[in-house]
Amino acid sequence: MSKNIPLISCSPFPASRKIYQQSPLFSDVRVPLREISLTDGSGEKPLNVYDTSGPYTDKEAIIDLTKGLPAIGSSWLSKRADTEPYPARSVKPEDNGLTSSPIPAFEKKRPILRAKSGKAITQMAYARAGIITAEMEYVAIRENEGLAIKDQQTVQSSPLGGEIPEIYTAEFVRNEIANGRAIIPQNINHPECEPMIIGRNFRVKINANIGNSAVTSSMAEEVDKMVWAIRWGADTVMDLSTGRNIHNIREWIIRNSPVPIGTVPLYQALEKVQGIAENLTWDIFRDTLIEQAEQGVDYFTIHAGLRLPFIPMTIDRITGIVSRGGSIMAKWCLHHHKESFLYENFDEICDIASTYDISLSLGDGLRPGSIADANDEAQFAELKTLGELTKTAWEKNVQVMIEGPGHVPMHKIKENMEQQLDLCHEAPFYTLGPLTTDIAPGYDHITSAIGAAMIGWFGTAMLCYVTPKEHLGLPDKNDVKTGVITYKIAAHAADLAKGLPRAQLRDNALSRARFDFRWHDQFNLSLDPETACAFHDETMPKDAHKLVHFCSMCGPKFCSMRISHDIRDAAALKKAKGEGMVAMAEKYQERGDIYVEAPQKKRVNS
């Protein structure tokens, strides 16, 4: 329940409850899943599904935004004993946009941690040292959706060389992280986060972007944007807030977020120089990195691959440079006629990231903003640089993923994945769509989901959602829900195509419910039970309608599934009759005579 905060979306899903699976390796690892109960008498067992919603859908949880979520990761950090508390930097007026903030600071203080001198505390460092962490065990159990781990495994091959095991183990997770093919984005200063993994040999993840409103009424309203996105399935959330209250808003979100939070630090750094890109400096940017690192940001988008020599390559593009971060850095480079300070200081960026185990999401500042510009010289020149920066980060045990396009027609999507795997050494790919056509403003969640499903099948590890408002305006709550669910569909379609373990179980369960006319089970097994039920009830709203063996589209006489039931029953009867004839034939063969002596009747004297 939510404590005196009605704005937060806290209700459980229908016919669902939160369950927790205990790790056999770590006593303090309990992994949340959502259990969907099915109709009594259906013969169906409850179905466990991956759950991103955190405590907000657990009816036993007490949600108090002023206290934040439980710090489930604190005990793991304490046992490893390789981090230390230290005095954090003081909050400055420019951190909140040089305004008096109507959103108060988060009052519950906690120690700010960093790596002890000489200690390598990233998940990649542990993985390379052969150490299985609690976080690795956590994500293995989570990816299995509660399925018991077996000793013997078979491996399912996926497109472009991926290998997916039948059952995930902590050792498999460790090996993927050690080789840079997967990341667990989890800042040591975000202990409230439930560990998750991003990599092409795991289920495809999705990210939702949120940002502060022009007029902010309360901190609960800002936190609820995050809660709403994760309710519908966002695996990570990027806070792209600009303007006023940035620091305080971010603190409230992180303290109450069970999923990794990403940012583009360049946006806040730009606010600190009143939006004048030419006035940006490395010192301002570095200070912003540390500010956000201490708050607990789990991954930074860094546009370090956009270099001065690449800018002229965009001159003949239809849409030029469409990345906000890319355009900021391009303007800075041209004004100073210098190499990007992000590129020049990338080593120190990695040092900061490794101190807090922050993952780097290497931004695609030169991504194509139209299908005409897809796969051009500028895009792939930057991608090659991102591959070089990946190796630099790996040398410092920093976890890395690579951001990708953008706008790409279907026949050019596979090349993007092939180039990324080759140039970026199989680091996880994180793409915005891609949008497969430019003719559908208002429907770009659909144009992009087509590309997202394809590139997810080919190996993209995480998809950044697109809402119906893309290119048009700021998305509202309904747009966020539509975008998240659309991308859950794309990610799930990719998981099915990759042959991911358990991916089809939910499809099969819903198909059986559909064929059996178990309407409530159909609703409850869907990604959006509320909408499924509402659409059904528009024409058949009564409770009795949930028991009938037809819907309003076909009616009782023309329902194909009802007819299929009749056909099945008739076939079963015919089979039974056929079996009776076979039995008679066998009896004849035994006796060898077509004539059978009739039983003698006793004659009754009259």
Curated annotation (Swiss-Prot):
A Pfam family matched in the record: ThiC_Rad_SAM
Residues that, per the record, bind Zn(2+): 407, 471
Chain segments carrying region Disordered: 84-103
Binding site for [4Fe-4S] cluster: 551, 554, 559
Molecular function via GO: 4 iron, 4 sulfur cluster binding; carbon-carbon lyase activity; zinc ion binding
Required co-factors: [4Fe-4S] cluster
EC number, UniProt record: 4.1.99.17
Residues that coordinate or bind substrate: 209, 238, 267, 303, 323-325, 364-367, 403, 430
Pathway this chain belongs to: Cofactor biosynthesis; thiamine diphosphate biosynthesis
Known catalytic reactions: 5-amino-1-(5-phospho-beta-D-ribosyl)imidazole + S-adenosyl-L-methionine = 4-amino-2-methyl-5-(phosphooxymethyl)pyrimidine + CO + 5'-deoxyadenosine + formate + L-methionine + 3 H(+)
GO aspect biological process, one term: thiamine diphosphate biosynthetic process
Membrane-traversing stretches: none
Keywords associated with the record: 4Fe-4S, Iron, Iron-sulfur, Lyase, Metal-binding, S-adenosyl-L-methionine, Thiamine biosynthesis, Zinc
Free-text comment on the cofactor: Binds 1 [4Fe-4S] cluster per subunit. The cluster is coordinated with 3 cysteines and an exchangeable S-adenosyl-L-methionine.
Subunit text: Homodimer.
Annotated HAMAP family: ThiC
Family, similarity comment: Belongs to the ThiC family.
Name used for this protein in its record: Phosphomethylpyrimidine synthase
